[in-house]
UniProtKB/Swiss-Prot annotation:
Binding site for GTP: 19-26, 83-87, 137-140
Chief localisation class: cytoplasm
Presence of keyword Chloroplast: no
Keyword annotations of the record: Cytoplasm, Elongation factor, GTP-binding, Nucleotide-binding, Protein biosynthesis
GO molecular function: GTP binding; GTPase activity; translation elongation factor activity
Protein name from the UniProt record: Elongation factor G
Native organism: Frankia casuarinae (strain DSM 45818 / CECT 9043 / HFP020203 / CcI3)
PROSITE patterns xrefs: G_TR_1, G_TR_2
Pfam family, one: EF-G_D2
Protein family per UniProt: Belongs to the TRAFAC class translation factor GTPase superfamily. Classic translation factor GTPase family. EF-G/EF-2 subfamily.
Length: 698
């Protein structure tokens, strides 16, 4: 690889900024853009002016909904930042971003510590093995406790924090940070919005604590890095360079997480955090080869090195509609080069595509690029058939890269246009939005003919309906939210025999199948099909039809028509007719045998349970717990945090609609809550009876 390309890759960082809602993630990103010279005026989220939050709704709601990708420069390094949303309804955005990132900055709120969404995002990052550093933000706030936040990282996230900075002062007296790597104090000046800071000696009254924490830092890193361990055992004090190198190695191996602190809003601590991104987070070369598989053969591994000499390969991780250039596809290039106008293959769908323009994105401004190489994140225009998770590659060297997993929606509502004129526009709007967001699903209810949209939570669907109105001018009526129930079976039934025959002159239909049906023990969505037919009792070409028939029958359960999950079908035996058997006949037989078996297998209804965390003043604690119990909630834990009480519970989603209003009135607006999907569980018999009766229209 030419040295200039190598140094370009070594100087690239693809990072995400991840956190709980309100931990100050967007503000942190804004400061990064300001100090790296991209922005001339700092945007504030609470004023609705942040650059990264560029959809109108985000500015109104003060939360980040779509992960905008932005490029900036720091210390001669190119940093591509993906700002991810922290609200749990938008988990899919985080999941997508993590798939294409090399490293991440986890932002924590110094007052609240590690919150539920932080845990979710951290676990997602663990799954993709993303090295990360932590930034404890809001050190200027009343109740900020840096050390408690570090302890919570250990307890809740099972992390190994390597504390490399201590706060200098706290709350209103927060002045700067103490750098434990270089053993210096950093003080920020207020007159230039924190753009410069001075490095001073550590004041006397902080020296003892600084020394104690530096010893802890050396110990933590030495335990996770052999080279530093040798120095440590020999009693040698490592140089700054040696310590930085050891921290980098341990961070890249995901053994430690360097922890920094500051207050993005008060412009303190952002530049050292950028230094840490450059010093400790990986570049595309550190990540090494991307492993995919050959087209049509998942067993054959295909490797792509992060080099421009390799064939082109990239992953599309986000689709967005842009008012000026149409459909933008954000891609992460893993190998090779891409130039504007060149043909590429979408190997996931086996469709040829042509790339129009290549754009380097800054939250909502853009610059054209002639070409782009391995390790870069850009948006391209002109792709017609590509959706999230698809692989793009060189038509002469096809490969399919690992895609992403998206959770199934848990809530759905009926939507209908207000006027006939809106009908056409609604279809277009829904199609566009579904292209952008894989957790937003659309179907037509066959019985009522209504359009049903499904998503990850009430806020998620609110935002989508709002976008239809703003971006596509569609006025629509939205029904009450409905819960996505599921069905499953409790016991195994054997040798269910079904014969499908129709012989009324002309060519008839004939198929006989014998199946076993049993629970598969998965967690929602599982289906297995095993063929044990021997001796050609059913010709091989008809076996997939039986499978397809079973899968079709699963979509409408036998109790209340909800999808059936977690089952295993074993095809044991059957019969066919030389003339009258067909694929359709076996599909019908498979479907009917499945329904028959499901009725006998003790079917039950499942409902989504939400993990709910309520933060409340102590004097309202009894009301909150009583209310959760009345909603069929199971209290999991109670704890104290920063003068408030935290109640954690599992509550059925069906009981949580309108909770925000009830909670406000019960606690005079002093309590807050967050919730996220946890699991599916069996519905109690008395409740199930009502749901089934309602579904059957009784």
């Amino acid at each position: 690889m030419p040295s200039d390309v190598r140094s370009l890759l070594a100087g690239t960082r693809n990072i995400g900024i991840m956190a709980h809602i309100d931990a100050g993630k967007t503000t942190t990103t804004e400061r990064i853009l300001f100090y790296t010279g991209v922005n001339y005026k700092i945007g504030e989220v609470h004023e609705g002016g942040a650059t990264m939050d560029w959809m109108e709704q985000e500015q109104e709601r003060g939360i980040t909904i779509t992960s905008a990708a932005t490029t900036c420069l720091w210390r001669d390094h190119t940093i591509n930042i993906i700002d991810t949303p922290g609200h749990v309804d938008f988990t899919v955005e985080v999941e997508r971003s993590l798939r294409v990132l090399d490293g991440a900055v986890a932002v924590f709120d110094a007052v609240a510590g590690v919150e539920p969404q932080s845990e979710t995002v951290w676990k997602q990052a663990d799954r993709y093995n993303v090295p990360r550093i932590a930034f404890v933000n809001k050190m200027d706030r009343v109740g900020a406790e840096f050390h408690r936040c570090v302890e919570m990282m250990i307890d809740r996230l099972d992390a190994t924090p390597a504390v490399i900075q201590l706060p200098w002062g706290v709350e209103a007296d927060f002045r700067g940070v103490i750098d434990l790597v270089r053993m210096k104090g950093l003080l920020w000046k207020t007159e230039d919005k924190g753009a410069s800071y001075e490095t001073v000696d550590i004041p006397r009254d902080h020296l003892e604590a600084a020394q104690e924490w530096r010893d802890k830092l050396l110990e933590t890193v030495a335990e996770n890095d052999d080279e530093l361990m040798e120095l440590y055992l020999e009693g040698e004090e490592p140089s700054t360079e040696q310590l930085v190198a050891a921290l980098r190695r341990a961070t890249l191996a995901s053994k430690v997480n360097p922890v920094l602190c500051g207050s993005a809003f008060k412009n303190k601590g952002v530049q050292p955090m950028l230094d840490a991104v450059v010093d400790f987070l990986p570049n595309p070369l550190d990540i090494g080869a991307t492993v995919g598989h050959a087209v049509g053969d998942e067993e054959t591994e295909v490797r792509r090195e992060p080099s421009e000499d390799e064939p082109f390969s990239a992953l599309a991780f986000k689709i967005m509609s842009d008012p000026y250039v149409g459909k933008l596809t954000y891609i992460r290039v893993y190998s090779g080069k891409l130039t504007g106008g060149s043909p590429v293959l979408n190997s996931t769908k086996d469709r040829k595509e042509r790339v129009g323009r290549i754009l380097q994105m800054h939250a909502n401004h853009r610059e054209d690029r002639e070409g782009v190489g391995a390790g870069q994140i850009v948006a391209v225009v002109g792709l017609k058939n590509t959706t999230t998770g698809d692989t793009l590659c060189d038509p002469n060297a096809p490969v399919i890269l690992e895609s992403m997993t998206f959770p199934a929606p848990v809530i759905h509502v009926a939507i209908e246009p207000k006027t006939k004129a809106d009908q056409q526009k609604l279809g277009t709007a829904i199609q566009r939005l579904a292209e952008e967001d894989p957790t937003f699903q659309v179907r037509t209810d066959e019985e009522t003919g209504q359009t049903i949209i499904a998503g990850m939570g009430e806020l998620h669907l609110d935002v989508l309906v709002d976008r239809m109105r703003r971006e596509f001018g569609v006025e629509a009526n939205v029904g009450k939210p409905q819960v996505a129930y599921r069905e499953t079976i409790r016991r195994k039934v054997e040798k269910v025999d079904y014969t499908h025959k129709k012989q009324t002159g002309g060519s008839g239909q004939y198929a006989r199948v014998i199946i076993n049906l049993e629970p598969s023990g998965g967690d929602g969505g599982g289906y297995e099909f095993e063929n044990k037919v021997t001796g050609g009792r059913i010709p091989r070409e008809y076996i997939p039809s039986v499978d397809a028939g079973c899968q079709e029958a699963m979509e409408f359960g036998v109790l209340a028509g909800y999808p059936l999950v977690d089952v295993k079908v074993t095809l044991l035996d059957g019969q066919f007719h030389d003339v009258d058997s067909s694929e359709l006949a076996f599909k019908i037989a498979g479907s009917m045998a499945f329904k028959d078996a499901a009725r006998k297998a003790d079917p039950v209804l499942l409902e989504p349970l939400m993990a709910v965390e309520v933060t409340t003043p102590e004097d309202h604690m009894g009301d909150v717990i009583g209310d959760l119990n009345s909603r069929r909630g199971q209290i999991q834990a109670m704890e104290e945090r920063g003068g408030s009480r935290i109640v954690r519970a599992l509550v059925p989603l069906s009981e949580m609609f309108g909770y925000v209003g009830d909670l406000r009135s019960k606690t005079s607006g002093r309590a807050s809550y967050s919730m996220q999907f946890d699991s599916y569980a069996e519905v109690p018999a008395n409740v199930a009876k009502e749901i089934i009766a309602k579904a059957r229209g009784e």
